[in-house]
């Protein structure tokens, strides 16, 4: 699906991290009632989708055992589903967690390993006829790259051969993303996942340099040319905050201004993404991002706007 074919407004996916250690909101929604209250808040602010995660993927985070992850996310999914038909995404790379979450009422699997971390994941998604976000994961493709070393290991075992990893090291970032997606999409096809159930995520903030992050964001339309909707997560990512810091803005999250600046900057990126026709943005602060989406989508869909004159504005 190209941006030209996307005649709908960008969907806002609100984040609920049911973890004690996520980089932005770890611990805030660890209890079931807190998570449910946050879900209600995000929906009221305009989220059409919620992304539920039970394991932090920030630099330095620890592996969460499968049963523990299931115990964190399934009660939250069941509670949300009991009172809302909002789309629910389960943020996990483990097939057993995905299977339990889908059975509990989730609609979509958001796999940060792009189906490459657990060889059973593609079959779980196919069996459930669920949608799946396949993320480009540079940490897995370039584990020895300086930008990857601070991240935890993703996946069971080694996903790529030593020769593949050596070849990946020399590829420009956009070529590396294409190579990764070719492998991931082949796995999806082999398992029987329907192409219309696939979204692609460029993996912003995962093992990328500042320049690589910016290049991938600038050229999102090239990713659209692969024929799939885009799912984008840039909210409160470190490289966005670094740009603010380099230019003298307050970014300390302990201050009201610093915290607000992080969301304002993230919303600016969402505006650029929505202008390019990105289908889904994954965000923490739905209210600010919704404003960005409304304005950017109105500009992108200008041909469909009402031709009001000044007298008709009230």
From Swiss-Prot:
Cofactor: Mg(2+)
The reaction(s) this protein catalyses: (7,8-dihydropterin-6-yl)methyl diphosphate + 4-aminobenzoate = 7,8-dihydropteroate + diphosphate
Subunit record text: Homodimer or homotrimer.
Cited function: Catalyzes the condensation of para-aminobenzoate (pABA) with 6-hydroxymethyl-7,8-dihydropterin diphosphate (DHPt-PP) to form 7,8-dihydropteroate (H2Pte), the immediate precursor of folate derivatives.
GO molecular function, one term: dihydropteroate synthase activity
Superkingdom assignment: Bacteria
NCBIfam families with a match to the protein in the record: DHPS
Note: The sequence shown here is that of sul-s (wild-type). The protein of the spontaneous mutation to sulfonamide resistance (sul-d) has an insert of 2 AA.
Positions contributing to (7,8-dihydropterin-6-yl)methyl diphosphate binding: 57, 91, 110, 201, 237, 282-284
Keyword Transferase in annotation: yes
SUPFAM superfamilies linked to this entry: Dihydropteroate synthetase-like
BP-aspect Gene Ontology terms: folic acid biosynthetic process; tetrahydrofolate biosynthetic process
Keywords, comma-separated and alphabetical: Folate biosynthesis, Magnesium, Metal-binding, Transferase
Record pathway: Cofactor biosynthesis; tetrahydrofolate biosynthesis; 7,8-dihydrofolate from 2-amino-4-hydroxy-6-hydroxymethyl-7,8-dihydropteridine diphosphate and 4-aminobenzoate: step 1/2
Entry keyword Nucleus: no
Secretion signal, residue range per the UniProt entry: none
Protein name as catalogued: Dihydropteroate synthase
Gene: sulA
Positions contributing to Mg(2+) binding: 17
Homology family: Belongs to the DHPS family.
